[in-house]
């Protein structure tokens, strides 16, 4: 692929590298950041307007934070060989396979809005702590974290800010001033009377050759070409897919790509009645609409726009009760049957029966459709090594297709777009399943309390500290919670870490006492992380006094008169009463289950291990099923600790577009 260049004007003479004050920068600009080409001239230097600067700031700021411009700029006052500007510094194969031919097309350019999506991107943090080890057991634990709330990681993090070196010390260059850093590129960014000069940094040995044998001017041109390639755009025509190469950061055609360039693998648009033009839904509402649409139980959704409300039919994709819009559409990537594919669209098929919508494989759905069309009374098929018969005698079965929902929280670490620049790939989803536990070397700090705890005044009985979405603990809790609570039905609002020194000390001492009587696997599975649903009015009381077995019976006492905990969040959700604002509350608690036995309604304490001895130890807990326990009941308040509080809500049927 040949790179387009800008012919210099007749009076432009190419000079050897010299101070940038002798050059000027000219570039072609349109209303919304079209491809930028630089032409350096002597004397009169053209500056970009404030509006253009503000439009470019989030783009370049994201590039700086993500490391996309690693090694590009370096201060002029650093000693370096002048010829080093032309030495190879990166080795990148430019022959990228792409199915996107360049062509003229009708499109609209979408300026990235980092306040809507980009702010959710987690950042990598350096750490020197020991690596983690994985031990297969039937429960979860959480990794050790630093005092600032970041997670220990053995992989060294790479920071773009370390490659930016200012000429003058009076110019702000701290990580908190990244918005200022991008204003200091020579001849391009100048604002608020600050000016700083940078040259290309070719000393670092990176893995690509993007700037090999390139002058400073040509390298800056490549930077702007990169910015052009990362811009978002959509086409007005129907039947066009989202470019998967763009999502993976490998589309080299930029705004000339015939496919859509969007933040996520899905994108919602609505068509205006007067102009018959498609316009994108707000970034904040993209995930909301997708989440609601993925639920097969939802057929229509209420929409708000400019003070008016109307309805959208999610089956026919029509809009009614308004004259402003008439149609709705969902842009998506190519389909795939692999549920582990991050970039593809995975379709799920549902058939309605007496109990609601039930998911079936696509092959079974095709059989049901054929039976409906031919008027057959029953459908026979085999699924999961079992034979099934569906009777169609009294009604025609309704069939529906909806995509598998993937939240921004799950997608963003994998996306190579401006709205989803990855920091570090998260662990595979199966790594946080109920069959494994993450055990760092040194689970507590030297002062006996978790390293993630922040300072609390001695007069405080407890505090609740919000858990950052960047923490590994957040991801573990998120995946464990949504393993049984569908993401398209409920959305996590906040996760709080409970700090109560008194309760923690009691719990730790009880754990040490129980561990002295256990060995091997029994000691490992002694501690579990289980859910407990409750109402808002008792959350603070539990955080201060712990779960109290004496007040049992509020919801159920089927397996004993104690405190109930469940492996599945879906079970605990049944006992989580929503507040007046529609918020549900659920604890993820540390529970010492120890040795357990089958429970019964009349038990006020666990039965003895050896009924024939008056000095026999008691069982530590009771369960609903001895072989595959899902519910645990404890009778002592020092066997549990209210570790995290999960606040979540039901997905609303109203979205602002």
Swiss-Prot record:
Species the sequence originates in: Homo sapiens (Human)
EC supergroup of this enzyme: transferase
Post-translational events: Auto-mono-ADP-ribosylated.
Residues found modified as ADP-ribosylcysteine: 39
Outcome of substituting residue 564 to A: Abolishes ADP-ribosyltransferase activity
Domain PARP catalytic intervals: 449-657
Result for mutant: residue 243 to A: Relocalization to the cytosol
Any one GO CC term of the record: nucleus
Its EC number(s): 2.4.2.-
Function: ADP-ribosyltransferase that mediates mono-ADP-ribosylation of glutamate, aspartate and cysteine residues on target proteins. Acts as a negative regulator of AHR by mediating mono-ADP-ribosylation of AHR, leading to inhibit transcription activator activity of AHR.
Motif extent (Nuclear localization signal): 41-47
Family: Belongs to the ARTD/PARP family.
Keyword ATP-binding carried by entry: no
Protein's UniProt name: Protein mono-ADP-ribosyltransferase TIPARP
Assembly with partners or alone: Interacts with AHR.
Activity regulation, short description: ADP-ribosyltransferase activity is inhibited by PJ34; inhibition is however not specific to TIPARP and other PARP-domain containing proteins are also inhibited by PJ34. Partially inhibited by KU0058948.
